[in-house]
């Protein structure tokens, strides 16, 4: 029997690309308990308002909500607990260099499966101001209008 094709994305932070300029992305493993993995596989994870921070040379993701697994009983952990991200030391040193600069933060973009393991796409990001968001919306609307015009002209 062949493997299932399709998206392995389990959760996505959709507002991240709207609220931040993404500078670099890193792939990180995440330290989870078995019931958390089962809950994530059911699609019960939320990355909204989550961020990562570096403490004592280790990277932790905060405010990532993973709903308790229904059949998990005593093995369920706190849904909003800090979870350790697994990165190489050299990557952590690069992230420390970025985050010490003013305005940069670490944002998880998505949770996905890779070879049966849950991974986090972690981005080094800089916050957008309100006028940057408006400019991005205007550019997107102009591009959509141009595409509509091109499609309309090529129809005849």
From Swiss-Prot:
Q: Which Pfam families match?
A: SmpB (PF01668)
Q: Does the keyword Lyase apply?
A: no
**What organism is this sequence from?**
Clostridium botulinum (strain Hall / ATCC 3502 / NCTC 13319 / Type A)
Name of the protein in question: SsrA-binding protein
Q: Name one GO molecular function term.
A: RNA binding
As for what it does, the entry says:
Required for rescue of stalled ribosomes mediated by trans-translation. Binds to transfer-messenger RNA (tmRNA), required for stable association of tmRNA with ribosomes. tmRNA and SmpB together mimic tRNA shape, replacing the anticodon stem-loop with SmpB. tmRNA is encoded by the ssrA gene; the 2 termini fold to resemble tRNA(Ala) and it encodes a 'tag peptide', a short internal open reading frame. During trans-translation Ala-aminoacylated tmRNA acts like a tRNA, entering the A-site of stalled ribosomes, displacing the stalled mRNA.
| The UniProt record lists the keyword RNA-binding | yes
For this chain's UniProt record, which GO biological process terms are given?
Answer: trans-translation
| Intrachain disulfide bonds | none
Q: Where in the cell is it found?
A: Cytoplasm
Per UniProt, what is the name of the gene that codes for the protein in this document?
Answer: smpB
Family, similarity comment: Belongs to the SmpB family.
